[in-house]
Amino acid sequence: MANYPAEGDVFMLTVRIATPPFKPDRSGFMEVNPGIASSYIFSLKPGDKVIMSGPYGDFHPHFDSKKEMIWVGGGAGTAPLRAQIMHMTKTLHTTDREMHYFYGARALNEVFYLDDFLGLEKEYPNFHFHLALDRPDPAADAAGVKYTPGFVHQVMLNTYLKDHEAPEDVEYYMCGPGPMSNAVVQMLDSLGVEPESIMYDNFGG
């Protein structure tokens, strides 16, 4: 779920594809049996009422803290991070904590909610958005979108944390693919960051 409470009765769901790899040598298209949830969602019509519950769990910001906050995300993992960031800014109007979001993607066309994060950066001087794309992206260059080539954990280290006075005093919030989360955790461990300062929803395993 990507929305925050102040957005009212609108629910934004960021869904990732979990189908097996496509094998074009066997057929010209992928045969996938429709799932229960996807079949239900695609059967809905405007005006239909649905019952929802959640989200559950303990992946949320420490609201009573004044520490700097760094979010790291990618793919569908940006959904809960957007909700947290929007709540900290739009709902709580937090201006006394430094906040950074390092967003990793393969290319510009895979980036969700870009306008939201760029808008927050203009509205809140204490919020900073950092986009990391795996490699130089002509589409991003043509659009004038600022980004740094490289994997997100490398970009975060090279452009910010390596010159940070006390990276161990920062709160880190992560959600994204397993390999990304693992790389970030290893990098933070090398900087002396304690596990208690790293909060994440590692849905990628």
Q: What is the meaning of each model-derived region?
A:
Residues M1, P80-L92:
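Histidine-anchored nucleotide/phosphate-binding helix
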Residues M1-P46, A105-R106, A132-P136:
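Ferredoxin-reductase
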Residues S65-K67, H87-M99:
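Conserved S-adenosyl-L-methionine
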